[in-house]
């Protein structure tokens, strides 16, 4: 029996809701996607709930679920994955956080992403914090992608029950850090001191002086959340399925998840995880990796950002760019020898400007697939698909079975 290879493509935040501006269509339905529509015609569609119906999923828990893990058992906070994704090697007693560079004016957060500052600016600001902030514990502060960064408090894992200072919307002041026990109280006090001292460093930094003169939001404040410790990963993906797996990813969080479950991670030049990402560089790398790997995962981030920014036409344009990326892959493989799955890690509807509990469209095509009667890849067409409505953790087992890499249960 011939074993096939697998390609899993996640278009981050793909799912959406009908939008008046797009004639009542979703961005996916509005976009011109000839390659995904072709795959829909020769493949099978469905809907998937990353966690469960009606439950908005974080990108971390959603990816864990899609890779086949129970996030309720495996997940111990986002911070660890963020830190792993920026190349940090953590000890089991370290406590990691995800961080946003933000804009603070008159005690109020006016922009949670500091005008989406560039990765280069964020890295320079992070370096200034690492070199100029002094707190009672050893720490690592490192820029990630765009406005994102990572904070690690060495040896403070017992204080993981600490809250966050992120108000989650502009126009509100930062929250005080909450705590549940003495260990987390100590962490909360350290974080308050860290944020205060970092603000002093950031507010007068030359990058922010320049941004002020240009009328851009300054990155003068840190929003800290997602306390995370070592996750509970019972078995690596690569061990469970006996495959050699690679990930083509730019975003730190998703890099971290992939690394944690045993993937080799690649970030080709030009892949940024931002609007300016080079999706064709990802396509070329994926095709190259398929020569040596059994399973290749490709992550495309900008669709999610457009949903958060409530920009439906941009989201549609980004989906069209993703379609061209997928075309390159399809043109360079034999679909009889490969199983391709395309979905999102969650829905990020433009009207919500955040993750929602809406199901996500799912497409599977390639060797062994029993095609249904769907004609186009979109949310409403997916409702008619032969896969029905499944959970995110069902995707990989379905792929592996089509790849002829599963074993019989029972005699």
From Swiss-Prot:
Gene3D superfamilies: Alkaline Phosphatase, subunit A, Metalloenzyme domain. Its EC number is 5.4.2.12. Pathway: Carbohydrate degradation; glycolysis; pyruvate from D-glyceraldehyde 3-phosphate: step 3/5. Inhibited to approximately 20% by EDTA. GO terms for molecular function: metal ion binding; phosphoglycerate mutase activity. Its cofactor is Mg(2+). It holds the Pfam family Metalloenzyme. GO terms for biological process: glycolytic process. Optimum pH is 8.0. Keywords: Glycolysis, Isomerase, Magnesium. It catalyses: (2R)-2-phosphoglycerate = (2R)-3-phosphoglycerate. NCBIfam families: apgM, PRK04024.1. Catalyzes the interconversion of 2-phosphoglycerate and 3-phosphoglycerate. Homotetramer. Belongs to the BPG-independent phosphoglycerate mutase family. A-PGAM subfamily. This is 2,3-bisphosphoglycerate-independent phosphoglycerate mutase.
